[in-house]
C-alpha cells in the first residue's frame, strides 16, 4: 500500500523454496486490515448522508467482506507467473501454500462478519480471476477444494449465495463451476465467451455479463 499510488501487489518470491518459507504478514497490517478502518469511517460518514431516488429516500448500506478475491489469486500475486509452472513442477508445495492462504482468508472473513454483524452463511462473492489460463483438470485439482471449503463456510442457497466472478475466457471451467462448486451466479464475464457457449450454465445459474470493451472503444 502506498498513499500516492494505486494499490497493487508486489511479487514477494521467485523460487519454490522461498514460497515454502514465506510467512504471511499479520493481516491487520495489510489492505485487509485497512478495510476495517474504512468500514468504520464509512459507517460514520453515511449517518449524515441522504440519498434519494425520485424523491424517495433510499438506504445506504456499508458492508465489510473480502469480496472478489481468492487464495489462488493471492498466490499468483505473491509469486507472479512462476506459480503457473510450479503447479506442474511442485504441486504439493503449491497446494500447501494455497491452503495456508485459505486459512488466512477464513480468519479474516470470519472477523469481518463478526465486526459487521453479518451471519456466517449469508453468501459469498468469490473470484478466481487468475485461474482462467489453467486447464479444467488443474482447476479441479488446485482451486475447487479451496473454493468449495469457502463456499460451504460462507455461502448459502440464495440466488447470490455462491457468486463467482471470472472475467476473461472461462467456458472450459464451466463444468467445475456448475457441478463441483454449485455456483448460483456468474458475473463480470465478457465477450471472450460467446453467448452460444454458455449453454451448460444457461437456465441453471444467474448469468450477468459485461459490456464488450470494443463497443466502448468504437
Indicate residue ranges for each PLM-predicted region.
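A contiguous, low-structure linker/loop signature
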Residues: 1-22
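Active-site loop segments of alpha/beta catalytic cores
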Residues: 4, 25-218
Amino acid at each position: 500500500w502506498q498513499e500516492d499510488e494505486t494499490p497493487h501487489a508486489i511479487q514477494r518470491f521467485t523460487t519454490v523454496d522461498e514460497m515454502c518459507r514465506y510467512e504471511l504478514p499479520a493481516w491487520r497490517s495489510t489492505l485487509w486490515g485497512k478495510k476495517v478502518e474504512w468500514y468504520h469511517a464509512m459507517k460514520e460518514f453515511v449517518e449524515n448522508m441522504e440519498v434519494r431516488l425520485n424523491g424517495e429516500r433510499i438506504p445506504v448500506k456499508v458492508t465489510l467482506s473480502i469480496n472478489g478475491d481468492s487464495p489462488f489469486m493471492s498466490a499468483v500475486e505473491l509469486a507472479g507467473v512462476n506459480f503457473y509452472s510450479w503447479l506442474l513442477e511442485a504441486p504439493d508445495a503449491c497446494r500447501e501454500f494455497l491452503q495456508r492462504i485459505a486459512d488466512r482468508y477464513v480468519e479474516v472473513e470470519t472477523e469481518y462478519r463478526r465486526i459487521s454483524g453479518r451471519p456466517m452463511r449469508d453468501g459469498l462473492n468469490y473470484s478466481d480471476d487468475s485461474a482462467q489460463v489453467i486447464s479444467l483438470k488443474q482447476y479441479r485439482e488446485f482451486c475447487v477444494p479451496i473454493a468449495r471449503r469457502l463456499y460451504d463456510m460462507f455461502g448459502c442457497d440464495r440466488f447470490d449465495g455462491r457468486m463467482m466472478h471470472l472475467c476473461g475466457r472461462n467456458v472450459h471451467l464451466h463444468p467445475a463451476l456448475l457441478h463441483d462448486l454449485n455456483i448460483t451466479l456468474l458475473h463480470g464475464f465478457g465477450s471472450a465467451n460467446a453467448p452460444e457457449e454458455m449453454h451448460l450454465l444457461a437456465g441453471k445459474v444467474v448469468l450477468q455479463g459485461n459490456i464488450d470493451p470494443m463497443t466502448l472503444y468504437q
